[in-house]
Amino acid sequence: MKSAEIREAFLRFFEEQGHTRVASSSLIPNNDPTLLFTNAGMNQFKDCFLGAEKRAYTRAVSSQKCVRAGGKHNDLENVGYTARHHTFFEMLGNFSFGDYFKRDAITFAWTFLTSEQWLNLPKEKLWVTVYATDDEAYDIWTKEVGVPAERMVRIGDNKGAPYASDNFWTMGDTGPCGPCTEIFYDHGPDIWGGPPGSPEEDGDRYIEIWNNVFMQFNRTADGVLHPLPAPSVDTGMGLERVSAVLQHVHSNYEIDLFQNLLAAAAKAIGCSNDGQASLKVVADHIRSCGFLIADGVLPSNEGRGYVLRRIIRRACRHGNKLGAKGSFFYQIVAALAAEMGEAFPELKSQQAHIERVLKAEEEQFAKTLEQGLRILEQDLAQLKGDVVPGDVVFKLYDTYGFPMDLTADIARERELTIDEAGFEREMDAQRERARSASAFGMDYNSLVKVDSATEFLGYDTTEGQGKIIALYKDGQSVDQLGEGEQGVVVLDRTPFYAESGGQVGDSGFLQAGAARFDVRDTTKTGGAFLHHGVVASGALLIGSPVEAKVDADVQHATSLNHSATHLLHEALRQVLGEHVQQKGSLVDSQRLRFDFSHFEAVKPEQIKQLEDIVNREIRKNTPVETELTDIETAKAKGAMALFGEKYGDTVRVLSMGGDFSVELCGGIHAKRTGDISLFKIISEGGVASGVRRIEAVTGAAALAYLNAAEEQVKEAAQLVKGNRDNLIDKLSAVLERNRQLEKQLEQLQAKAASAAGDDLSNAAVEVKGAKVLAARLDGQDGKALLALVDQLKNKLGHAVILLGSEHEGKVVLVAGVTKDLSSQLKAGDLMKQAAAAVGGKGGGRPDMAQGGGVDVAALDQALALAVPFAEQGL
């Protein structure tokens, strides 16, 4: 059976047993912040098992895409070198949420594996393990299913603690847990290895193909197991492993799915397909990379993006080992989509996007790969012992973008290991430097502790009445704030919006009788709104009633920019692709800043598309609508939630242009899209690997920006004696004339240098039979000095030459040594001395070198070094 047929058979079998077929969840877990990637079929059902979520079904079946690379489950360095380690795999699973339990779970598994209608595996090839004290499961297997006792193995606490066993599953130190039973396939005596539980169990003869976890207990902090009222079942069977069994091969890389990917990888690289470990690495890694990018991950230097970058770069390096020329990895995506796109349509729909991301990352890595490998080879050549020092590993990571496991991979090929602890120490030191650099002053949001929550009035008004419930000065609670004192005021009710979701906090003032407090910013800690500012007059007392008034003009301008970010977000997804995710924003009254995930610079024509889409929505002048609902209803309506953001039971859904933009947002917004008036992007650039930033203006600020640009056009036209209509032609003519003049200048300088060369050759002094010439030629650039040194070397025939110039406020130096002397005297050595004398650096070949510096006053002193340099070397 082919892998795709096995997958479909599994899903269909359990559907016939009353299970609901559930699609694979994303590789980015949406309900578990402790997980880097989805790594098991049960991840998406975690809340069902915990009783926190009720679904319309109590039986489920799925084929879940999983990634195990980085974090706790990191087998990256083994991938390609063993038969069964992968960064990506499919987990087939059936699940019961308080429905059936051990008897049905065991019967289902056995029927599917051994029945002629399904997989028809020989029963005598199957071994079974149970937890040592799980007599119930043991009896079901032996007395009801009929597995003979000689193929049954009880596994006890083999990990050094109670319930720490290969056959006892726990979610943590406390919580749901229970025994499990595993089914193993015996590949036969030709393969080394022993049955589970034996000293030889790590061999490849007996391979686990199915695991049934029985969530039977709740473990409390005292270690006691309490029976769960509704026990559940979580099972998993690796598709790749069972495919190897059914296709009668002993390595996962020999199954049909991998054979096609290996062939595609060999073709893209231009190498043979002979089972090389490096080719297996590439074939494995295209799966994890393709699926991760399809699920919205982009290469970066942190978190999930960094794991993706590590996998891509490892694949590139192994392709390079096999002789790949240029970018190759992205070319295998088509084969991946053809092989797995039927079961996972996102591979086909996002094929072009995946290819673009991989190609861009390959090209970026290629720039440093060769140089980094050369540095590593130099370090390894000087290595004493068999451990690569941590500082070397860190240098390669920090300077050349080599992930630690890539260096470990290269070291492994030379039977070396790396000093991981030393690398981590270097990383910790770097993090500490970063923390020190980012230290800043007092943070009221962490210092202020307020039990009461503030009622927010600002969605409906910019003015309101409230009462002072807390005052703070220098982070300390006080009873009053006097005139001229800076501090924080907390009210029971306020119309001031507190900084959140990228929107800056409101400003304005609080009036308490004769006392006035100028609010410069508003933030939030817990449920309390903190009004930061200074007492302009009088004194504020706890308990005093106040009139709160927001600066409505500033808030209105800010709200327009905030609404524009929502329109921009959707426009970005339409123009660049659905992989775009918000990575940060800053919205104030002057402009908006929007950070988003993308792998390359946004092209000028794409900028125009973005502006056209946003301005089209503005011109439609549709209402900006809000609705309070629960999170699941909001998501069902297509509302975008920011990844990593925490949402309560009730969320605020903001819709613009009907269903054009639907997001969860608690900010202040325009009433209608037409209020924004105009949208103009003023800059685009990168802020981090895989993260781009757009800055834009709206309304009056956008009009002012365009007016200023118009004035600049007019001024430019006047400078070239033209007008707006012929400005481009005029500028082109000026630039062409400038190019011609520069060419003429170069020719004149060359003639002058040639004439100077004739004169200079006469100024050379003789040192031990060689001519030594040092001269100052102010105004000449490096190019002219190089040409002159070449000319002088020909004239003098047997010489050391050092020329210097003051050019545009800096020192330019060129040194030359004729070939016959370059084995004794090296121009690069002379240049290092001369450049150092003028506060700079330099270097080059033995016969020619360049340098420079900033200390013009020391130029003559630097030139004087030529004669003693020659005297010492000859």
UniProtKB/Swiss-Prot annotation:
SMART domains per the UniProt record, alphabetical: tRNA_SAD
- Where is it chiefly localized? cytoplasm
Q: Which UniProt keywords apply?
A: Aminoacyl-tRNA synthetase, ATP-binding, Cytoplasm, Ligase, Metal-binding, Nucleotide-binding, Protein biosynthesis, RNA-binding, tRNA-binding, Zinc
Q: Which gene encodes it?
A: alaS
Protein name (Swiss-Prot/TrEMBL): Alanine--tRNA ligase
Q: Which InterPro entries match?
A: aa-tRNA-synth_II/BPL/LPL, Ala-tRNA-lgiase_IIc, Ala-tRNA-ligase_IIc_anticod-bd, Ala-tRNA-synth_IIc_core, Ala-tRNA-synth_IIc_N, Ala-tRNA_ligase, Ala_tRNA_ligase_euk/bac, DHHA1_dom
Q: Name one GO biological process term.
A: negative regulation of DNA-templated transcription
Q: Which reaction does it catalyse?
A: tRNA(Ala) + L-alanine + ATP = L-alanyl-tRNA(Ala) + AMP + diphosphate
On whether Metal-binding is a keyword of this UniProt record, the answer is yes
